[in-house]
Amino acid sequence: MMLVTSAAWFEASLLEARNASLITDRLQAFHAADGALSLCTRALVNGSMFAPSAPLQPGEPAGWRQKGTFEAQAVVPVVTWPGSARLPQCLVEAWRIDSRPAARAFVVTARGFGVDDDTQSWLQAQIVFEGTRVERHWRRVVARPF
């Protein structure tokens, strides 16, 4: 009986160790994406990052959902990110809001990585410039787009 109990406790400890490792990996990816998003939005607001021109069609941009577009146009805002498989990336896309024609709006999408490429965290910020006012809205992308 003690052997069975010991084996069960051992299996439970292994499961807990794996879960802790997965949580650590997800946190690593989240912090990488959050850092990239902060750096890219700050650079966009300061004017030190290239801001694409407004698109012809209305609606929120969807280039970040396409692997080819994201990989080709994303920038890497840091030189190194310890503990991540790849450096975090961000993509800035212009956004035309029909209800606010005087506003210049952008969607900034950031992707951070954990210890391996499969662990990713995606975050977005919507930045709207209208006159001297800057609006910032943050959101987490729940499902990986690709």
Role assignments for model-derived ranges:
Residues 1-146:
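Terminal alpha-helical segments
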